[in-house]
Amino acid sequence: MQGALQNLAAVIAMRTNVGRMNEILDAPLQTGSEQLTNQGCDIVFDHVGFAYNSGETVLRDVSFTAKQGEVTALVGPSGGGKTTVSRLAARFWDYQKGSITVGGMEVSQIDPEKLMSLYSIVFQDVTLFDNTILENIRLGRKGATDEEVLAAAKLANCEEFAEKLPDKWNTNIGENGCALSGGERQRISIARAFLKDAPIILL
């Protein structure tokens, strides 16, 4: 009976993963021709409206400016669209109404790869790999030295848990960081963002 339930769970997980993969493959290819110019990194939402493909409206007539060099915090209830705002700024999705600019440039007109170079993103559902703490953080900037990785890790307070582990920074954390707590996984995500050292951090 237990084996059957495990097989059922595996089938459900496989169907979920296939569904997510199909969503990615079916998504339209994003394009953008404008190269980045040195106009700062202010993020401006001007009367932005956004709804998911299901028709659910998430944002309606949203306007604000996140100034370069300042911390901008969005406060609201769970499900209020705070995460959606950061994803739209990074163009994970395209908005239907209004305008979003970074440094005066419309995000939909910027080459996606160039746009992403502006952002370090701390995901709530961080993806970790069956590797060491150091190597998981190094994904923030491939080619970074151990010293650079450790500096970013300590800035994110990863040493509070890493130094207590059997192999410290070289401890293997298991698939998706199963050996760590949720808070510890989040700190690795923050360390990655610090290591990338992009002009804008989205939390």
What do these predicted regions represent?
Residues L25-N38:
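Pre-NBD coupling/linker segments of ABC/ABC-like ATPases
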Residues G3, N7, Q30-T31, H47, ...:
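General structural signal for alpha-helix termini and helix-helix connectors
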